[in-house]
A protein has these predicted regions:
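Catalytic active-site module of serine/aspartate enzymes centered on a nucleophile-bearing elbow/loop
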Residues: 360-413
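Ser/Thr-rich low-complexity repeats and stalk/linker segments
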Residues: 34-85
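Serine-hydrolase catalytic core
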Residues: 281-353, 386-392, 399-400, 405
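Short, solvent-exposed beta-strand-terminating loops
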Residues: 251-259, 343-366
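Cap/lid segment of the alpha/beta-hydrolase catalytic domain
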Residues: 135, 147-209, 216, 255-258, ...
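Glycine-rich His-Gly loop
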Residues: 154-158, 224, 315-316
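N-terminal cap/lid segment of alpha/beta-hydrolase-fold proteins
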Residues: 2-12, 17-26, 43-46, 51-53, ...
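Primarily recognizes the serine-hydrolase "nucleophile elbow" in alpha/beta-hydrolase
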Residues: 161-165, 201-272, 283-295
């Protein structure tokens, strides 16, 4: 009997799906296609060609793709190789709580079959609370139960606005996660004119004041410009005890940072060093001033003041920033002060936008404030492997350094 199956058909977006086909002709070659429309109607598609075994069966966990968007054994390849129909599209889940991404799997040419898989960014029982207290704007995701839960602030970068999908997944794993907006949202400034660290301290205090949040410290997960801010929080805010910085910088760039009476002026950028590739996208990697330059020392973040643990997640094919160099400078700075509270995980072939696993690589996209698309980099196969491994390491890091009371076995995990 012919059958196309995907198990589980409904799951968290960071869970793998087992795809199988039965009832084909022996050694038959077939095409599998995945397609998805985001909430704005943008289409993303992938496909791969497979040969059934002598029993007429196909199992993506052990059978290699012969061609298409990837080659070899990649059980989740149809998911992470999804590509936008329109150039420079980025797949972002906007509505986290009430609707999944629906991915359609199609088998053809003969026989034809189709099924749908649901990919959720939150789990049953998770609560979403809109936060509009004082100056703080965001969305707090609470796991089911009374808690207390380890708290995490979630920061994205120059895209601005409020992105909630990573916070929703963190809540599904037992963390209370505050997706925090800091510009281009609600009544916040439309452009990032400065980084006001007092705002982020207000958010940390608000999170810790919630009755379901474990005290005395919180974590931060951050990427790109957000990771620059996340590192500043680790340096200056005693509330922050565990920080993940994904492809960020170790100094202040673009706009000044203010905290109480302190002002850090930004290191200048040199836009004349911009490179535009054949697709019309911009590579910014070589545009930044060097934090090691004596004139820029006042802009370097004092990482030696950080009291908590810091994990740098680095994609070595980052086309936006020389993120490995920045992380190495930060770790050297720690070591020169006799500190050992930071470490770096390097991922060859991974680009700038390292996301939760099984999401597609975004090699380049349009972003706020730039007239041309920006290059993020990444090799699809290596980037997918990096996202899977990095997410495991991030969850393990927060369980080890934040959630000891909640997950008593976490130090051995």
């Amino acid at each position: 009997m012919f059958q196309l199956t995907a198990t589980p058909a409904s799951a968290l977006a960071d869970e793998p799906v087992h795809i199988r086909v039965m009832g084909l002709a022996p050694l038959q070659v077939v095409t599998l296609m995945a397609s998805l429309k985001d909430e704005k109607g943008n289409l993303f598609q992938s496909r791969a060609f497979y040969r059934a075994n002598e029993a007429g069966e196909l199992d993506l966990e052990q059978d290699p793709a012969l061609g298409g968007d990837f080659v070899g054994v990649h059980p989740m390849g149809l998911f992470w190789s999804l590509k936008p129909e329109k150039p420079f599209g980025r797949l972002l889940k906007l509505e986290v709580m009430n609707s999944p991404f629906w991915i359609t799997l199609d088998l053809y040419d003969s026989p034809r079959a189709s099924l749908e898989v649901q990919r959720w960014f939150s789990s049953p029982g998770v609560q979403r609370l809109m936060i509009r207290e004082g100056r703080v704007r965001g969305a707090l995701f609470l796991p089911p139960g009374e808690g207390p839960f380890p708290g995490i602030i979630d920061l994205f970068g120059g895209i601005g606005g409020l992105l909630e999908y990573r916070a929703g997944l963190l809540a599904a794993h037992g963390f209370a996660a505050l997706a925090l907006a800091y510009f281009a949202y609600d009544d916040l400034p439309n452009q990032l004119q400065e980084v006001d660290l007092d705002y982020f301290e207000e958010a940390a205090n608000l999170l810790l004041a919630h009755p379901k949040i474990q005290k005395p410290g919180i974590g931060v997960i951050s990427v790109s410009k957000g990771a620059e801010i996340g590192l500043a929080m680790a340096c200056y805010l005693k509330q922050v005890v565990a920080t993940v910085c994904i492809n960020g910088r170790n100094a202040i760039f673009e706009v000044p940072l203010r905290y109480r009476d302190l002002v850090l002026t930004p290191i200048p950028s040199f836009l004349e060093r911009m490179e535009v590739n054949a697709s019309g996208a911009v590579r910014l990697r070589h545009c930044m001033g060097d934090p090691r330059d004596e004139l820029n020392q006042q802009s370097v973040l004092p990482i030696e003041k950080s009291q908590g643990q810091i994990l740098f997640i680095i994609g070595e094919d980052d086309e936006c920033l020389n993120s490995r160099d920045y992380a190495e400078q930060a770790l050297d700075q720690l070591q020169s002060h006799g500190r050992s509270n930071g470490r770096m995980l390097l991922y060859p072939g991974a680009g700038h936008l390292i996301e939760p696993p099984y999401g597609p690589l975004c090699y380049g996209s349009r972003t706020r404030g730039f007239p041309l698309p920006l290059l993020w980099g990444g090799d699809p196969v290596l980037h997918a492997a990096a996202q899977e491994q990095a997410w495991r390491e991030i969850l393990k890091f927060f369980r080890q350094h934040l959630a000891i009371l909640i997950f008593p076995d976490s130090q051995s995990s």
